[in-house]
């Protein structure tokens, strides 16, 4: 499955001195001389001022202006803001175009927010009770194209706060008024006009609607205003936008292939898992074939961890709320925790959102010596976390999940080796499971101090340890400021699903906080008691999320060792059913998962049904194979080989044992 690609070009950089008395010079004035022989392309600018904007923004002597020519797909100025990417600028401008079209077609509509997102954009609308569906999208898109062809400029203005509120109030745009009150600081408000349409926005934008040529509206969804379930539910319209029609066409083809691989679709088609409203959203049911795959994954994970010195334990799914008060989760993680179960005697029990407090208690069941360290406690433990219904997605984001979790208790001088060992284990799991493309993110804290436990020095030490571990292993990484856990920084292994959405699959975290909160000590070699360090790690992540990734990675055609049905034995006629059963029994004796198809159906039908289930091998038996004790083996490439039954048993047993892909 190929993704649409755009060949990168070197960004054009322009330095120009503008006389102070010409303060009204537009940023667009320099664009024609900057364009390398292609006329005047779409552009955006960045300026050191509160509101960025390309057309109506003036510049003063001593200020610098950056012009992004939009035939440069990915300029790199060493910054990471979304507006530094001209493709994001184009998509954000297309979101404004969408809102302008909606307001023309539905004057009563109230518009919320419309950002650029990965591969596209969206805008949230309140249609006043009117139902809007995907059947309405062609008309909206048609109006967008009419506005685009009208060559309407994006005009940036800075209004006094009072005037901005009045402008939106007279349009009855209550959500924009609310945003000004809640989000905009100071006495000036940055807005953009596109014809009669007015939006609250910092920019930047393309020069004109005429620069928006390759876009398409994709789907409609519901979304609570500002992500709050207590606020009105709005209609969210998603779209995509690209610089050229060819890139748009490539992207749409990519989506067609991604849809075929979507784990929610394949999970239903292959009968791997189900979701039922009677059970509840985000609470998937593992069906027999899905549960078989999960057992294989867990067996593989546990066996490898045991071979690396981990001790596997079992702990309960609930604990007293006081345990999570001591760990800090009740104070700093409560939005993801379920309400406690309260009893008449005053006891409060909590569904656990994490496993670490339980493993800490196991550590404290006896006095530990330096000889006991490092102590690696592991578990595939059930966790329960509240997620808003709008964020739930198949198996990828759920409310109940089983986490491949471990906590390593070690001395400070053992820390580096343990972090590197955890990274190595995650790499090994990725190699065997076929997670070929991933990236590292070093997730650190931000400056909001009440979100984090511990001192700045402790955080710096922990972050340095993780960075050093990655660098010593030759791994590159990016930083995710503000993405750390509340008790410490972490390394996140980021992977992408079939739709290129990024998510965290594995983590390694260094924690100096919980050892302090739980007074975790060990007896050192000199007989004194010392504080130990704790490493949290989830080398394979949650079983549900890993499962969703593997479904899409293999499009349901799992490697033989993972597939719930490794062989289908198909008889050509009823008279060979007894031999088919013998073949099935021999395979089962070698711990091969097999189904014997003795239905009174044509052989082509039996093969077709096995192919739909993406079974790795089909062993056909008939008048030629039965007397000789052979099987005719068909694999997923349609390669056919007749061989003795024992040779086939040896071949498939080796493939399963070696976990070949």
Give names to the regions the model predicted:
Residues 14-16, 21, 49-52, 58-110, ...:
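NTP/phosphate- and nucleic-acid-binding module
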Residues 2-5, 9-22, 27, 31-38, ...:
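Low-acidity, Ser/Thr- and Arg-rich intrinsically disordered low-complexity segments
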């Amino acid at each position: 499955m190929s993704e649409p690609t755009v060949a990168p070009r070197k960004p054009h950089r322009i330095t120009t001195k503008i006389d102070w008395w010409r303060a009204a010079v537009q940023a667009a004035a320099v664009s024609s001389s900057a364009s390398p022989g292609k006329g005047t392309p779409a552009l955006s600018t960045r300026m050191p001022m509160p509101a960025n904007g390309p057309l109506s923004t003036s510049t003063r002597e001593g200020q610098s202006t950056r012009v992004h020519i939009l035939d440069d797909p990915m300029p790199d100025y060493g910054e990471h803001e979304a507006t530094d990417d001209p493709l994001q600028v184009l998509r954000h401008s297309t979101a404004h175009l969408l809102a302008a079209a909606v307001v023309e077609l539905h004057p009563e509509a109230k518009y919320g927010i419309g950002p650029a997102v990965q591969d596209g954009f969206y805008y949230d609308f309140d249609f006043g009770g009117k139902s809007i569906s995907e059947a309405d999208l062609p008309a909206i898109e048609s109006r967008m194209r009419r506005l685009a062809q009208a060559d309407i400029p994006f005009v940036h203005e800075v209004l006094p706060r009072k005037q901005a509120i009045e402008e939106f109030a007279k349009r009855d745009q209550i959500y924009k008024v609310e945003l000004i009150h809640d989000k905009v600081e100071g006495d000036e408000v940055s807005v953009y006009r596109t014809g009669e349409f007015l939006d609250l926005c910092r920019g930047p934008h393309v020069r004109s609607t005429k620069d928006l040529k390759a876009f398409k509206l994709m789907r409609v969804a519901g979304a609570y205003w500002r992500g709050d379930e207590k606020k009105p539910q709005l209609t969210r319209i998603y779209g995509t936008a690209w610089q050229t029609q060819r890139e748009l066409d490539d992207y749409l083809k990519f989506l067609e292939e991604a849809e075929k691989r979507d784990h929610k679709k394949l999970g239903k088609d292959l009968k791997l898992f189900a979701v039922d409203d009677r059970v509840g959203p985000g609470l998937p049911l593992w069906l027999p074939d899905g549960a078989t795959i999960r057992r294989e994954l867990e067996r593989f994970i546990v066996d490898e961890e045991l071979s690396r010195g981990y001790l596997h334990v079992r702990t309960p799914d609930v604990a007293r709320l006081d345990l999570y008060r001591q760990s800090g989760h009740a104070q700093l993680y409560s939005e993801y925790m379920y309400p406690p179960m309260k009893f008449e005697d005053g006891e409060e029990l909590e569904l656990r959102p994490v496993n670490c407090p339980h493993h800490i208690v196991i550590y404290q069941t006896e006095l530990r010596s330096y000889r006991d360290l490092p102590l690696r406690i592991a578990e595939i433990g059930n966790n329960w976390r509240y997620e808003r219904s709008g964020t739930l997605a198949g198996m990828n984001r759920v409310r109940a999940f089983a986490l491949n979790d471990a906590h390593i208790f070690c001395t400070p001088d053992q820390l580096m080796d343990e972090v590197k060992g955890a990274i190595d284990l995650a790499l090994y799991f990725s190699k065997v499971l076929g997670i070929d493309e991933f990236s590292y993110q070093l997730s650190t804290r931000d400056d909001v101090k009440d979100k984090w436990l511990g001192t700045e020095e402790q955080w710096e030490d922990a972050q340095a340890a993780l960075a050093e571990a990655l660098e010593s292993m030759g791994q590159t990484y990016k930083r995710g400021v503000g993405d750390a856990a509340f008790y410490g920084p972490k390394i996140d292994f980021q992977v992408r699903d079939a739709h290129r959405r990024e998510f965290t699959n594995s983590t390694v975290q260094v924690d100096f906080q919980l050892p302090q909160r739980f007074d975790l000590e060990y007896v050192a070699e000199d007989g004194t008691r010392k504080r130990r360090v704790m490493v949290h790690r989830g080398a394979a992540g949650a079983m549900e999320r890993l499962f969703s990734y593997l479904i899409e990675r293999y499009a349901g055609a799992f490697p033989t060792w993972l597939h719930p049905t490794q062989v289908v034995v198909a008889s050509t006629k009823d008279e060979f059913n007894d031999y088919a059963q013998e073949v099935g029994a021999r395979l089962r004796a070698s711990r091969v998962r097999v189904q014997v198809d003795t239905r009174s159906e044509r052989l082509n039908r039996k093969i077709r049904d096995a192919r739909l289930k993406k079974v790795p091998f089909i062993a056909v038996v008939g008048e030629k194979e039965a007397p000789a004790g052979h099987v005719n083996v068909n694999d997923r490439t349609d390669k056919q080989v007749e061989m003795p039954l024992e040779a086939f048993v040896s071949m498939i047993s080796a493939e399963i044992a070696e976990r070949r892909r």
